């Protein structure tokens, strides 16, 4: 009963002020629902965030790290992994229904949901039609911890196949630092030049780090 009483406060706060009013601890407590022996759910949520440093650290943790927290088992690990997957699928659907140019923040959130936590560099392309609506997106290349081989002709071939008119490029830096490298800038220039011959526009290249991003368009590089 104590756990349920403790959980009532975040619920009441959510109903009165909206879900965004909850702290990370309160939001995590809502999902955990119950604490462990001798520890209420709010205390447990607070300790978990302290152990992992942030929600990002928690949601991208492996089971070996997660099970090191006393009293936490596979059920709660599965709950939190389910939350992360729900968010990823939500942005997947939303991307198909909204124009990335009308909601650049949503586009970044989508890319973060797709690429955050990956241990290798992944190069993604969002393919858009002439109205800048999403046709599809693809993890078109994958590489190592700090490098991914990108071939512009493969991107163009896929764009032509699905009749795309514009592209948004994206890749992650598993190191966590989103600052583009010289190689990132060079491959972006190569892709843009190759696309120009086929009347394809590259609208942006977004690099995803740990809790940060860099947009080539916002920097004025595209």
UniProtKB/Swiss-Prot annotation:
What keywords appear on the UniProt entry?
A: Hydrolase, Metal-binding, Metalloprotease, Protease, Zinc
ATP-binding is among the record's keywords: no
> Which intervals hold domain MPN?
100-222
> Which GO MF term does the entry hold, naming one?
metallopeptidase activity
GO BP terms: namely: proteolysis
**Name of one Pfam family that matches:** UPF0758_N
**What positions carry the motif JAMM motif?**
171-184
Binding-site positions, Zn(2+): 171, 173, 184
Q: What InterPro entries does the database record attribute to this sequence?
A: MPN (IPR037518), RadC_JAB (IPR025657), RuvA_2-like (IPR010994), UPF0758 (IPR001405), UPF0758_CS (IPR020891), UPF0758_N (IPR046778), UPF0758_YicR (IPR022820)
CDD domains attached here? MPN_DUF2466 (cd08071)
The keyword Hydrolase is annotated on this UniProt entry:
yes
**NCBIfam families reported in the protein's UniProt record:** PRK00024.1, radc
Q: Give the similarity note.
A: Belongs to the UPF0758 family. YicR subfamily.
Q: Which PANTHER family match?
A: DNA REPAIR PROTEIN RADC (PTHR30471), UPF0758 PROTEIN YEES-RELATED (PTHR30471:SF3)
Stated name of the protein = UPF0758 protein YicR
Name its species: Shigella dysenteriae serotype 1 (strain Sd197)
Query: What taxonomic classification does the UniProt entry list for its organism?
Result: Bacteria, Pseudomonadati, Pseudomonadota, Gammaproteobacteria, Enterobacterales
């Amino acid at each position: 009963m104590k756990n349920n009483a403790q959980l009532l406060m975040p619920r009441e706060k959510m109903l009165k002020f909206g879900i965004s009013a909850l702290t990370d601890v309160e939001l995590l407590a809502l999902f955990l629902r119950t604490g462990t022996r001798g520890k209420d759910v709010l205390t447990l949520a607070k300790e978990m965030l302290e152990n992992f440093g942030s929600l990002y650290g928690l949601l991208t943790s492996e089971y070996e790290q997660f099970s090191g927290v006393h009293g936490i088992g596979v059920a709660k690990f599965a709950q939190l992994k389910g939350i992360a997957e729900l968010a990823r699928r939500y942005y997947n659907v939303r991307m198909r229904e909204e124009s990335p140019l009308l909601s650049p923040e949503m586009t970044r959130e989508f890319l973060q949901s797709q690429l955050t936590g990956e241990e290798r560099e992944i190069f993604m392309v969002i393919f858009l039609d002439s109205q800048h609506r999403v046709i599809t997106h693809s993890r078109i290349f994958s590489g190592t911890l700090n490098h991914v081989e990108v071939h512009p002709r493969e991107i163009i071939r896929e764009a032509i196949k699905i009749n795309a008119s514009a592209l948004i490029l994206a890749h992650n830096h598993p190191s966590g630092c989103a600052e583009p490298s010289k190689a990132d800038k060079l491959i972006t220039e190569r892709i843009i030049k190759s696309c120009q011959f086929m009347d394809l526009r590259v609208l942006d290249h977004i690099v995803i780090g740990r809790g940060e991003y860099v947009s080539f368009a916002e920097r004025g590089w595209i």
